[in-house]
Amino acid sequence: MQEMNGAEFKESISELWQAFQEYGKDPTNSTNQNLIIQKSELFLTRCNTVYSDLQKYQSNINLQIKDQVDRINEIGDKIYALNLEIQKTESGGVETAMTARDARDSLIDELAGYAKIEAEEDSTGYVRIKLEGQQFVQDNKCNHIGLTEEKGTGFYTPYWPHITTQESYMPVFSDVALPSALAERVGCTQTTNIATSLNNDIGSLKALLVSRGSEYGTYDFMSEENYSEVEDNVVMETQAEISYLARNIMMAMNDIFCPNTTYTAADGTTYTVLDTANCSVGADGSLPPHELFAREGYDRYTQMEIDGKQFYVYNDETKANNSSWYKLGNVSVNPKLAAQVTLMPSYKQDGSANYGLADQITKAWSAENLYINPKDTSKCNFEGYYDKIISHLGTNGSIYKASSDTMTSTAAAIDNQRNQIMGVSSDEELTNMIKYQSAYNASSRFITVISQMTELIVQLI
């Protein structure tokens, strides 16, 4: 969030608010108009930087997922090869392949750190392994884990190629949510449902998948029906919160400069149109006015004739067209305003300065109508929303760190106890036993000689 790296992100929000306050004093002043453009660009840059940094964090985790899957497959191949070596060495019933067994045990230990496994050794010394409930090391091969890469995000999803068909996609983890595009493509809908009580919170690979998330968090995840998809993922939730905050600021300011209303046509169709009776205009007095935050390649209005009258119909956001959304990455400060600030809608249509904009902006900025998430019970304004993001993030971080420290300490204690038994080398212990036995024999002979000499001296006396 860059709170510890130079200027705070919150400063861009505060500076934007200060710019709007100055603008309200004299909206026709080009200096004040320029300040709005500059601070709006700074605000969007900061938002995009924070959002992009979180995306890079996800990409870094994504690469770790690929590395771990590659390592798991490598371990599987090595265990399979060691199985054959152990069988060959011990087939005569005379030798024990201790070195190979130690190497295999070490690999199985490492594998258990990546995912939930079940290992079973038969009478010939061959170990068969199930990974997340599926056959991994079998009698005649190791079943490799495959990776599905999503377009756009590049996110990897581990799956089982040997049991995946056109009719049935088999992800390695059935309790981790799939990227929405993949889930729709393969017809496999599943949600993240991991808990200690379910005994499925096992392995670093699953932890990485959950930490990365299934996709990038956007403002629409903050709705009541979608929030559960990001609730347990800190990165996606923070992305969604930043996206939601930026969107609400952009929409609020655009609705002030370019207010909309509805019109019902004679045929019953309802349109969202520019409120030409109440909108402001730029210095040129033309309609429609220019919005402050514009979607790239997507105009705010389309001029249409309805019932014999001219209207500026609002080009609404649609799911079918991603570029129609007011969201980070799609929006920039209107290039027409950046090129000519006097086009900013600061005038009434009679040519006088619209000082009423100041009250509208103040009301919109200070209005407490935002919740940090659907479970929040106290509303806040724009700046209060950001404070809640930081507080929420800090609280989660503190909880996760305490939990991590506790589990790390517990794991270390268990591993120490285990190594007291399993970590002992049989060859080393056998060497010590032989050494101690030889020392005992030498000591025994020395005592016997002394005893005999003492007895002889007594007899001579």
Where are these regions (language model features)?
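Structural signature of extracellular appendage/secretion-system components
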Residues: M1-I461
